[in-house]
A protein has these predicted regions:
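Surface-exposed assembly/interface segments
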Residues: 1-316
Length: 316
């Protein structure tokens, strides 16, 4: 008798909520398991799970043959951009800085981190589609290898297009339409983009938010393939996070309490660093793991993780 799960572990068995607590999973992560079915047995095999965080803000299209490494700092002049505030408007100098969180032959997926003034003052900023702190629809960006200070006569790359990352994220199902194509659900039809919670921001943390959906992929439960069984939105990677006093938003604790179908186990494999511990020389943050308190943490990112529960077995 085993629970269906997503992850690299060989198997897992959690008999009940009481057993979950007895195993210490209420306080400790489950190694090698991203999510697990609430009760053991084969019934949960095939349930589709999708998790999304704010892995990137924009996708830049660059010339074929791109070899830029994940973690590279990306900069672009901000000179002349106009910022509106309560006291009127001001004109920016300096540059916008981001970090590469994924790199392909023709694209750079980039997360916006900060504005650096001409005087060298670093201010954390948040991307907003069509806003001030982003990379222009096309143009030139500077590239600086992680661990090196930004220089203005370094490596540049011209890109032909910058598109919104979140708008292009989908939940891909194993069920297909009449033409044999996989059914897909657009993430922006499910929820607003995740980012940084108010709780984490107040403690100097960033990028803790995530969404989780549970889907009846084959229609085994509802009779309708692709039905969303549960939506858990604006959860947090931070262990101490709360929506309000006494109301947890920590993803594992929240799912253990609220979800009918799944427990949260531990961060997905292969999370990517989304910040620098020393911005002046772009030293990658080495303490970005999920499932720790929010204070001062730039939480690592995973993008979209979509998988089917499997490995659940009955007696015999």
């Amino acid at each position: 008798l085993k629970n269906a799960f997503v992850g690299a572990a060989s198997s897992i068995r959690i008999k009940s909520d009481t057993h979950y607590n007895q195993l210490g999973y209420d306080d400790n992560t489950i190694t090698g398991v991203t999510v697990a079915a609430k009760t053991p047995g084969s019934y949960a095999n095939g349930i589709r799970i999708s998790i999304i965080d704010s892995a990137a803000d924009q996708i830049l299209t660059v010339p074929s043959g791109n070899t830029v490494q994940v973690g590279t700092a990306v900069t672009q002049t901000a000179v002349g951009r106009i910022v509106s505030g309560a006291g009127g408007t001001s004109v920016l100098d300096g540059y916008v800085k981001g970090i590469v969180t994924k790199s392909t032959d023709t694209t750079l997926e980039v997360k916006v981190l900060s504005h650096v003034s001409a005087a060298g003052t670093v201010t954390n900023v948040n991307y907003q589609q069509g806003g001030i702190y982003n990379f222009t629809p096309s143009g030139l960006v500077g590239l600086t290898t992680a661990g090196s200070a930004v220089v203005f006569n370094g490596v540049d790359v011209t890109y032909t297009q910058a598109v919104d990352w979140f708008e292009r994220q989908e939940v891909v199902l194993t069920s297909t339409d009449a033409n044999g194509n996989p059914l897909k659900i657009e993430w922006d039809a499910i929820a607003d983009r995740p980012g940084t919670s108010t709780y984490a921001a107040a403690r100097g943390g960033r990028f803790d938010e995530l969404h989780v959906v549970v889907i009846d992929d084959k229609g085994k439960i509802t009779g309708n393939a692709g039905t969303i069984l549960e939506k858990h939105l604006n959860l947090s990677k931070a262990k101490d996070a709360e929506y309000s006093v006494g109301s947890t938003s920590y993803w594992r604790k929240y799912l253990a309490t609220v979800s009918q179908y799944i427990y949260g186990g531990s961060e997905p494999a292969g999370i990517t660093t989304a910040g620098y511990s020393i911005p002046s020389n772009n030293t990658l943050d080495a303490d970005s793991g999920w499932d720790q308190d929010a204070d001062g943490v730039n939480f690592g990112v995973s993008g979209v993780i979509t998988a089917s529960l499997g490995g659940g077995t009955n007696y015999g």
